[in-house]
Amino acid sequence: MPLTSRQQLAVALIFITPAFWGVNYLVARSAPGVIEPHLLALLRWLMAGLLFAVPSWRELVQHRKHITTDWARYLLLGALGMWICGAWVYIGGRTTAAINIALIYALSPVLIAVVSALWLKERFDRLQALGVALALAGVVHVILKGQWTSLAGVNLVAGDAWILGATVSWTLYSVLLRRWSSPLSPMARLAAISAAGVLVLLPFTVWEVASATQPVLSLQGFTLALLAAVLPGFAAYLAYSVMQRELGAARVGVVIYLGPLYAAGLAWLLLNEPLYRFHAMGMALVLAGIYLVNRRSH
């Protein structure tokens, strides 16, 4: 069965969206000592929420009864997608190494595929399972720089617990986004979820600001929040929502695997970090995995 035009767009977004998320690696690297994690997450989703709401405000007003009726669902999605997957990553990044973050987050597509197959009854055959395994192998190959024996030397620290929590949270967010149908368009739905996320983040941010011993917001900190709002916030989440709707949670989950590869590309472009053969090998495995997961049965 050929892909529809919407599904073709969703497949194209699989290769575009990780570039937006890759920006978050740069933001997370620059944030410590500049802006507090909850404040960064709150400003990110406050600004991204406005970007979602402005073009969809008529729809939000039209469906206000639905939003108020399902407020608990939106609050949970906001907590999972904006608080835990936002602030917790920035907190964990203070004490854990980048290799640990990437390795733990690489579990997310596997968890999404398993939960989607068991709970949502999404069709997921053996070749698609092989695709997930290939993509996982590709990203681990890049993270370990082709030296698989170094996997035994990875040390776990307290920050890993924050990243593991964010990984599980992203799995639940992805599956629930697919599970809970909504009359709202992706844009309007994300506006409502962002508003809920800001509400969840607010008390933690107030506590963070009240206990701060240095200025809480500078021009550099605001710039980081704005950057996080526009690309890994507005653009990435909107694209992910569209992909979820058209392709399903399990098939879209492998997009996470492109993140470290795109981050390596951004580091090469912006930070002059070199690219090696293990990057090419990892990319080949990831692309093969994505093809198997998203192929169409005839």
Question: Predicted segment positions?
Answer:
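Helix-helix packing/entry segments at the starts of transmembrane helices
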Residues: 18, 41-43, 86, 101-107, ...
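Specific transmembrane alpha-helical segments of multi-pass solute transporters/efflux pumps
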Residues: 20, 24-25, 53-105, 141, ...
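Transmembrane alpha-helices of multi-pass small-molecule transport proteins
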Residues: 33-84, 111, 169-176, 190-209, ...
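Specific alpha-helical transmembrane segments that line the substrate/conduction pathway
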Residues: 39-50, 89-123, 128-129, 139, ...
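Transmembrane alpha-helical segments that form core, pore/gating elements
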Residues: 26, 52, 112-114, 118, ...
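Glycine-/small-residue-enriched transmembrane alpha-helix faces in small-molecule transporters
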Residues: 1-42, 91, 152-179, 200
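Membrane-interface helix-cap regions at the ends of transmembrane helices
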Residues: 27-30, 34, 48-68, 137-153, ...
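Juxtamembrane helix-loop boundary signature in multi-pass membrane transporters
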Residues: 1-16, 107-168, 278, 284-298
